[in-house]
Amino acid sequence: VSPVVTFVVAVLVTLGSSVLLVTRIERVGARLGFTEALLGLTTALAANSPEITSAITALARGQRDIGVSVVLGSNVFNLAALLGLGAIVAGRIDLHRRVIVFVGGVSLWIAATGLGAVTSVISPITSLAIVLFVFFPYAALCAWPGVVRRLGVPPRTTKWIQGAISDEESELATAIHPRRGDWRDGTVAIVALGVVVLASVVMEHSASSMGASLGWSSVVIGGVVLAGVTSLPNAVAAIYFASHGRGSVVLSEALNSNNLNVLAGFLVPAAVLGLGHPTPPDLVVAYFYAGLLLVALSVAYVGRGLGRLAGVVLVVGYGAFVIAVST
């Protein structure tokens, strides 16, 4: 069987199983009483399982360029497709400034730390510790918003954080409304996760073979082909929410997806397997991700959202990224 046919079949199986996994995870989360923010974070992790698995597979095989570029290339695609294309289709994505600072601040912290790991300025293990130092409290606040009152922070800061979480929760509550699941949903989720992992491994292997036969570089295989294909479901969902005025949902989906990619798909395996010396393609992908994220958040904060022009800028930025890694 040709690598192209194997790749296409693996992609279809991966995406189909991912959709099934996400819906069942949502139902299980509803049964367990997850907050809307935690449910969104959990489903983002489930939705990211293809790119995370592909990245881990590549790093385990010693294909650093593919492993790094799948994760960070997917993040560049998310910014362009979820935020950029979403703003173009919807006309405008309105965003609460507190949500931009709260969620965006965590994303900038993780992106900067990931950049430090890619460039070997910070070791993977140290980078992982730095990211977890911020991500654990963020996840805890998503799960138990009331815990902020017991952290000993000033009352004014407590009120601000609670307001940011409330702004995010208010939109997520209307966007995420799964029925309460049972043991059958949990069983289906476990089976779907296994299928996603196996199909993603096949997808990464076949993409590498296909790219080699076509003369593509490893960064094109990982940062453009695998990254774009595995992120398509997130893009479709984000465009839907953007067109229905759920701006905070789009921002949370894009940034939480990116955060989990860096954490689970890059830093955790890098801390275990090591990274070696940075290569020029790795640096191009990493700098494009950090730069486009900074542009997106800055424009969103100043304009209290993203209009069509901002969306075009992000999409053009992705086009420049594709050209840069392809030459």
Question: What residues fall within each predicted segment?
Answer:
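Hydrophobic alpha-helical segments, chiefly the membrane-spanning helices
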Residues: V1-T327
